[in-house]
Amino acid sequence: HGRGMKHSLPDLPYDYGALEPHINAQIMELHHSKHHAAYVNNLNATEEKYREALARGDVTAHVALQPALKFKGGGHINHTIFWTNLSPNGGGEPKGELLEAIKRDFGSFDKFKERLTAVSVGVQGSGWGWLGFNKEQGHLQIAACANQDPLQGTTGLIPLLGIDVWEHAYYLQYKNVRPDYLKAIWNVITWENVTERYMACK
């Protein structure tokens, strides 16, 4: 990014209350307007410091800033995907080539759903469960990432569907019962978006 190329908070493609009753408006508003906004603001500030360190030739400083870039940049990347993976018209099953690929790589849609649910529920502490595409091998893979580690930068997989299992994504509604949140989120996942991502990278 050149100077003045700042990251900005993307608009949600729906209202804060649109995913009710599965994810309530209070969670969506805080998650988007506070949590995601903070990642964007902090990413911009960190990139500015990083550019200054590079300009000074200060290798120590720019190495020291890399974990912050990964965390804040990952937070921005991950949430930007997450919002578009969700829709009030979500739920159901994918169709066409994505469904065929899911059946090929996981046996059935239900088996895939069970597997991604188990991986997401099993994340220790904060993190994400992902459906990704392994371009080299030409197949779908499920992976978990810690904290805000971005899927592609961490595993090389291209992100298709992300499930945020940070407590801020569900605690106000589901308390400490992460499996209940996972059960609910399948009702608002939009397979159209996941399919678009799949078709664009395969």
UniProtKB/Swiss-Prot annotation:
Cofactor(s) required, per the database record: Mn(2+)
Keywords for the protein's UniProt record, in alphabetical order: Acetylation, Manganese, Metal-binding, Mitochondrion, Nitration, Oxidoreductase, Transit peptide, Ubl conjugation
Q: How is the cofactor bound?
A: Binds 1 Mn(2+) ion per subunit.
Catalytic activity of the protein: 2 superoxide + 2 H(+) = H2O2 + O2
UniProt enzyme class? oxidoreductase
- 3'-nitrotyrosine, modified sites: 39
Could you tell me where this protein is found in the cell?
Mitochondrion matrix
- The N6-succinyllysine modification is found at 49, 103, 111
Mind telling me which PROSITE patterns this protein's record contains? SOD_MN (PS00088)
Purpose: Destroys superoxide anion radicals which are normally produced within the cells and which are toxic to biological systems.
- From the Swiss-Prot or TrEMBL record, give the protein name: Superoxide dismutase [Mn], mitochondrial
Q: Which organism is it from?
A: Oryctolagus cuniculus
